Amino acid sequence: MNPATHLYKTSVLAIRTAALAAALFVTTSAPARTAHTANPKEGGGNAPAQSDPDILRYNNPGLTVDLGVGLWGIPLPVDYDGDGLKDLLVSCPDRPYKGLYFFKNIGTPRHPRFAAAERISEKGMNNIRLSEADGKPYVLSKNFEYPDFFKAPYAKKRRLHYEGEELGATYNKSRSNMWSYADWDGDGDKDIVVGIDTWDDYGWDNAFDSLGRWTRGPLHGYVYLLENTGRGYVNRGKVEAAGAPIDVYGAPNPCIADFDGDGDPDLICGEFVDGLTWFENVGTRTEPRFAAGRPLANKHGEIRLHLEMIVPVVSDFDGDGHPDLIVGDEDGRVA
């Protein structure tokens, strides 16, 4: 493991996000069907009674299940149908469910509940990210913004140019490259915050010696700032915390918001495994400066997700004025 992610074991105060790792739920609406195994006592083709232990019921109407899309769920929280409730779009970039799915919120702001998924695009894109700026949702991927995404997904894209060193150019292997808009320095424009990981030190999970000792290095996850100067974007390099570049255990997926309610933007990062790291802004609104990272926790302890490859996205999901975290997981579920 990356020492940077396990150096801090002090509990961070519970912040005003609903970041508990609780699964969201979907109510199915398909007709009920039954199947049954062969039973020699039945004779002929008689259907078994409902109490028969051999019955296997499926497609039960009204059944509540975990919201999910299959492999590598990437959530995009947005009021997709314009009814005032945040819904969920979830991108699944791989087989067998590849595509973009719409989950309509049929609950309430405080108690969201979702209808069964509707596939709205056969294209399921990896490293796609929703961010909110100027009170509007935007969808970005590496080097691009997708205008009118919620009317016609992927139909249009606009290249995002920047000056300076090419991001990730020196990395041989990178799996996570997430871009989001944020007003980094409080000047009213949209800067771009980028999270990139590199697997160059780690390699793959076959680097144990005969004694079970790890022989390579950790995953690395860095955060970069592309500042909007009014004339274009400029790469300002890696974002630092406590005087050193932020480096989480892969897949940083940076989330920028005023999480502690003190008027300046803080930073929460994900990682390739199952935790979140909280970086408090100890600077100002116009000149952010971050304290050393601490595991995100509340009164119950450190917040952990069910699996790994987590994708946190910041959104005021329940409309109470406080930023929440919507987190995708490796198996496609969303917390």
Q: What are these model-derived regions, one by one?
A:
Residues 14-27:
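Bacterial N-terminal signal peptides
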